[in-house]
Structures are given as C-alpha cells and as structure tokens.
Amino acid sequence: MGIAGKTLNRIGRFYRQNIVKVQYPMLTSLSRRILKKEGTLGVVYMLHHICEKDAKLIPTNEDLKVSPAFLEEIILKYKKLGFDFVSLDQLNEMICSGVPNRRPFVAFTIDDGYLDNYTNALPVFEKYDVPFTIFVATDFIDKKAILWWDCVEELTMTHESVTTSDGKTYPCQTFQQRWNTFRYLRERILNLDQNCLEQGLNDMFARYDIDWYGPIKEKGMTWSQVEELADLPLCTIGGHTVSHPSLKKISPEEAEQEIREGIERIAQFIKQPVRYFAYPYGTPHEIGEREFRIIERLGIQLAFMAHQGCITVDNMKHVTRLPRVYLKE
C-alpha cells in the first residue's frame, strides 16, 4: 500500500474511532454507517439558525436552530481531538489537487442568511479562529423572502384549528396536533407553484390575514452585514438562489435564472467571485441531474446538498453534489 493509501486508512480509522463520540447526539444512523467506511476524509456541517431553541415551538423549525453555546461545545470537542477546521477554499484545493488533508477535517456552512448568523455565529467562529461559509438566498437580504414556515407555525400556535380554502380543517389544540398540522401543511406548500408562491399561499389560507413578509423583516441580514462578513478572512459567502425555491418545481430556464441571478447579485455587493453554492432544501426531492448540469454550466466550483453524509474519497469527485451533515442540537 502506498503512502496515500496509508494516509487515507489512518484518517478513516481516526474517524471511526472518534467522530461518532463527538457527534453522538446529532448523527443519524445513516451518518454512522457512512463514517464506518474506509476513505472518510472529513465532514461539512450544515446549519441555519444560531440561536436559543424554544421547546414550545414546532420541532420541524426548532431543529434548524443550534445555540451559540452548543456550537462552541462542538468546536472545542473537535479542537481537543486534533481535527483541522477548513474553509471551502481549502476543501476545493484538496479536491482539485487530489491530495487529502493529512488530518480529519471539519467545515461549517450556514444556509439562507439569517441575522443571527451575524450576531450570534460570527463571535463564536472568531473566538476560536474557525472558518465558515454562509450560503445566501438574496431575497432574504432584500427582505423579499416568504418565510412561510414561520407564518404557518404562528398560525398553528394562535388558533385551535386551521382551515384551508378547500374546507379541510387541521386541529391545533395540543402540541402533537400543531406539529402534525404543520407537517401536513408543509407538504402541501412545497407542492405549490413556486413561481406564484405568494398567490398560492393566499389562496390556501384565504380565511386568515397573514403578513408573509413579516418574519424576514426581523430575521434577515442586511447587505452591509453581508459585505462586512465577506471582507473577513474567516468568512466565505456562497450562493443559495434568489428566492429559495424547490428547484425541481420550476422550469430548467427558471432554475438556471434563480441560481445565476443569486450569484450575480451577491458578487455585485461583495465585489468577489462567488464560487460555491448550496441547493435550497437540498434533497433528491428538490434537485437532480438537471440541477447538477446547471451548476457545471455556470462554472460553480463546489455545490452542496442537504443529503446526510461525509466527504469521502469516492464522493469528493462529484463536486456538483457534495454531501453535508445536519448539525442538530
């Protein structure tokens, strides 16, 4: 066995022996199986909100949150084990050169562009000198994003039941009922026409007076904050489309436009090329070969899914569909 093979096996053994201990609350059974394979090189974490959780709210939304203290704990555990913290530029260099990192690595990525990325996550990453990437959906920054998941959650929290325009009524009196109702409504919303989402939502919830743009006015970053982050050595800004659509639900031309215009708008503000991308929602239900070809055509160097998995010798070659691990507190 050559030096490279010995290095990969050493890294694989290190991961199998240590990473499950570090991540024991967060790893799914799928992640555990992946980590047992030879050739595991590193893990790219996916986060959304860095803020305190609220046990009274819908778990589907709360699972997108990790507290600053928890993020700090994860960083400290990896530091203690001797893992390297890498930027996406460093990961890209590994992939392009074909030379893996000599030690297991961790990369942190955050999706969407929430304000708490700036107020809560940045201080933690700066404290420990850890690089990170924020994948920005530009409508979040332009305050045009419809955070329907927050609006629907509020609806379930403030009504004993929710009745949609087709006459179906969903109970909301208990915690479990609210959660079930949210999940049912979520599936229906994801199947709406993404090109006229607001109209579809208004039609579905015609009985209620909902300000679909209310949440983003409070929860989104500003362009000046994005620019400030982009100027920091630790932070990379990546693309995440314009409006965060389910890409499979729109035409090929519209999907390419969403990806391209999002990247161009970010580049316009940060005065830097945008080389990396994360797919909205990011599972095989929302993306496929068509989207991978668009990424290749646009010259994006690395694109990330929400699919659970670590970076391995095999999948690191597929730069349009790299997996991530969902960091869950």
Question: What do the PLM-derived regions correspond to, one by one?
Answer:
Residues 111-113, 118, 128-133:
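Conserved beta-strand->loop/alpha-helix structural units within folded catalytic cores of enzymes
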Residues 76, 119-126, 202:
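A broadly conserved amphipathic alpha-helix scaffold signal in soluble, globular proteins
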Residues 2-108, 116, 147, 153, ...:
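C-terminal active-site subregion of NodB/CE4 polysaccharide deacetylases
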Residues 76, 111, 122, 226-227:
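Solvent-exposed, non-membrane alpha-helical residues enriched in polar/charged side chains
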Residues 73, 116, 120, 221-224:
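Short, well-structured alpha-helical interface segments that form or flank functional binding sites
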Residues 45, 50-51, 103-106, 126-285, ...:
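Metal-dependent polysaccharide deacetylase catalytic core of the NodB/CE4 family, i.e.
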